[in-house]
């Protein structure tokens, strides 16, 4: 059970679904679902963490524990963010973890090992909602209208994983 495994890594104790430390499984589940693509305290709240017995004071330590237990994922977020940023800033090509980023004809292409491409229209550097520099691009927002969207390492990783997971039947 992935949620038991996650909780076990985070809290350094064995966790069994209906056995030892089973009370920690729910924390592992919420953390796995909310934090895997860069979420933090806000994502935990959005996933209902406070409704599942977690307290406000437990949320930040839970984020920290998940990230400590998953250093390779956190590093992948950073590496992908650096690659996308370099690609957009320098209008160049760069590769990380077998994933190629290329700027061409006003678009950023992410070439996946499967051969599939992800395309980001009119990418440029801008400020995100926190006031930090990030890659932005034109896309369709929640209101089904074109607008400038911000992105960052974990979001690109989410798109990459989804792109790799698609199956044609």
What residues fall within each predicted segment?
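Conserved catalytic core of nucleotide polymerization and phosphodiester-bond processing enzymes
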Residues: 1-167
């Amino acid at each position: 059970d992935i949620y038991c495994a996650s909780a076990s890594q985070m809290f350094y104790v064995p966790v069994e679904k209906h056995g030892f430390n089973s009370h920690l499984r729910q924390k592992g589940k919420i953390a796995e679902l909310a934090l895997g693509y860069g979420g933090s305290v806000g994502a935990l709240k959005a996933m209902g963490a406070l409704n599942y017995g977690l307290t406000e004071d437990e949320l930040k330590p839970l984020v920290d524990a998940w990230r400590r237990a998953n250093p390779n994922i956190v590093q992948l977020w950073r590496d992908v963010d650096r690659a996308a940023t370099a690609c957009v800033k320098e209008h160049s090509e760069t590769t990380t973890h077998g994933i190629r980023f290329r700027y061409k004809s006003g678009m950023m292409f992410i070439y996946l090992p499967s051969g599939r491409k992800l395309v980001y229209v009119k990418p440029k550097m801008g400020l995100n909602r926190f006031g930090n520099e990030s890659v932005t691009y034109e896309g369709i927002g929640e209101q089904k209208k074109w607008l400038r969207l911000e992105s960052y390492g974990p979001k690109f990783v989410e798109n990459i994983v989804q792109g790799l997971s698609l199956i044609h039947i």
